[in-house]
């Protein structure tokens, strides 16, 4: 899980979602997981 100021899709399988007011990226590749902090 990377915590970044700006999250964006890295590949086509990345999906931007909102959980508890936080923007997150979920992907089949675990290295692409990101959270906005």
From Swiss-Prot:
Record gene name: rpl36
Matches recorded under PROSITE patterns: RIBOSOMAL_L36
Listed name of the protein: Large ribosomal subunit protein bL36c
Localization per Swiss-Prot or TrEMBL: Plastid, Chloroplast
Listed GO CC annotations: chloroplast; ribonucleoprotein complex; ribosome
Organism listed in the record: Cycas taitungensis
Transmembrane segments: none
Gene Ontology process terms (BP): translation
Similarity remark: Belongs to the bacterial ribosomal protein bL36 family.
InterPro entries recorded: Ribosomal_bL36, Ribosomal_bL36_sp
Swiss-Prot/TrEMBL keywords: Chloroplast, Plastid, Ribonucleoprotein, Ribosomal protein
Molecular function terms, GO-annotated: structural constituent of ribosome
């Amino acid at each position: 899980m990377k915590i970044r100021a700006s999250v964006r899709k890295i590949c086509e399988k990345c999906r931007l979602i909102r959980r508890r007011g936080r923007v997150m990226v979920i992907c089949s590749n675990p290295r692409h997981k990101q959270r906005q902090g």
